[in-house]
Each structure stands twice: as C-alpha cells, then as structure tokens.
UniProtKB/Swiss-Prot annotation:
GO terms for biological process: DNA transposition. This is Tyrosine recombinase XerD-like. Residues 1-75 form the Core-binding (CB) domain. It comes from Lactococcus lactis subsp. cremoris (strain SK11). GO terms for molecular function: DNA binding; tyrosine-based site-specific recombinase activity.
Length: 238
C-alpha cells in the first residue's frame, strides 16, 4: 500500500499556529519523501525509524509523533485501510536529564473564593500559562464565558485556550479586570507576591507540567503557549 499524500488536507483540519503548521509540514514532507518509492509496511516503518536514528533524540521523537498523528488521520478518514504506528524511541537518560524532575503541584489554595488581585493573577498563569506581558494585553472581552474559551493574540497569531469551569465560577463575576490588565508589570509582580511565595515563572512551569501529563505533544504545547520554537520545552519531554 502506497502512502497517500494528504498533508495539506491534514494541516487544514488542525488548528495549528503558523509556526506549528510549518513544523508539522516539514516533518510530514520528510516522511512522504521516504515512502515515495516504498509501500507502507511495518518493516518499512522500522527502516524509517532507523533512518531517524542519526537525528537527536528530541528530533526523533518529534518526527515519530508527527508521523503517528498523520497515520491516525489517514486511517480515520479511510485514506489507508490499516492503522500504522511507529514505536517511540526511548531516550537514554543523561546526567542533565536526570537532574531535572520538577514536581507537579495542584495549588488548592489558588481555588478558594477570590479574595485579591494576586489570586486572580495566579489563576491566569496556572490555568493558561500566561506571562505578565500577555496578561497586560488582555481585555475582559477576550473571555467568552458562553462557550468557555479565551482568545489571545500575539505577533499576529491568535490562540484559543479552553476555560475550565473551576476557573470560570471563580472569576467571571469580576467587574474591573481591565483595570488590572492595564497596570504595570511591577504592579502585577507585587500583587502576585502578596498572594503567594511562588513566582510567575514557577506557576507557569506548573501549567506546562500539567499539559505534558495530560498528553499534549510538544508542538501542541508550544502552540498553547504561543512559542515560536519548541527548544524551551524539550527538557520536559526527555
């Protein structure tokens, strides 16, 4: 069975940012080129995986993840009559990767009755992975409470982030959020510090850890965070 070229159809069906779309495109073109003169068989998939072994472990995992998602799309849309999946590579642990294992925290104290601006800021960072610069660009109208999503625009790219009910029930009654969003970075820093000893960076990392635990791919997570590259996230996928 030949590998059909449905790359454009696949990318159109996904709500990727321009950068994430570009990453998937090149990964899938690489896959398509390999199978140009080969049939898709389990043996051929093993050969493809072997060819990837010359790349870094992170690049191998990325290309395999892209390929597996593409195979699933083809199978679900009846473009191929058999589902194929490449087994992910197991990255050998190195001293650097072993030394970085941050613990996931739940922060139940963040989800009490809303009592101060710092608590609202902490929730924005933990629920959406926002930094202070992104919070300063928010408008209350960006929150769609009917359909439970937050729209953020950064460098001309829009991100649509889901709003969880546990966040909505605590903050949607706020009347003066735009006043907070208009404050200086120093003001936001001070208010967060009044509420918790955790820094914005530490809280944002917890958002990342929870998304990794939930099964988000490195590309999906980069898209959620509005990142133009995946470099800063690779350590969480080792």
């Amino acid at each position: 069975m030949k590998l059909p070229n449905e790359i454009e159809e696949y990318l159109v069906s996904r709500n990727f940012s321009e950068n994430t779309r570009s990453n998937y495109y090149y990964d899938l073109v690489y896959l398509q080129a390999f199978f140009e003169d080969k049939s898709v068989t389990q043996e051929a998939l093993e050969l493809y995986k072997h060819q990837l072994s010359k790349l870094s472990p992170a690049a191998q995992r990325r290309k395999i993840s892209s390929a597996n998602q593409y195979f699933l799309f083809l199978y679900e849309n009846k473009k191929i009559n058999q589902f194929f999946k490449i087994k992910q590579v197991v990255q050998k642990k190195t001293q650097s990767s072993e030394s970085y294992h941050p613990m996931i925290k739940e922060f139940p104290e963040f989800y009490g009755p809303l009592s101060c601006p710092g608590q609202f800021l902490a929730l924005l960072i933990l629920e959406f992975g926002l930094n202070f610069a992104e919070i300063q660009k928010l408008k209350w109208e960006n929150f769609n409470w009917n359909f439970k999503y937050l729209t953020i625009e950064k460098a001309g790219i829009k991100r649509v982030l889901p709003i969880r009910e546990k966040f909505a029930i605590r903050v949607k009654a706020i009347k003066n959020a735009d006043e907070l969003f208009a404050k200086s970075r120093q003001f936001l820093y001070t208010e967060l510090k009044k509420f918790t000893n955790y820094s914005s960076k530490e809280i944002r990392e917890q958002y990342i850890l929870h998304q990794v635990k939930a099964g988000k791919t490195i590309y999906e997570l980069a898209n959620l965070l509005g990142l133009s590259t995946i470099t800063a996230l690779e350590k969480y996928y080792r």
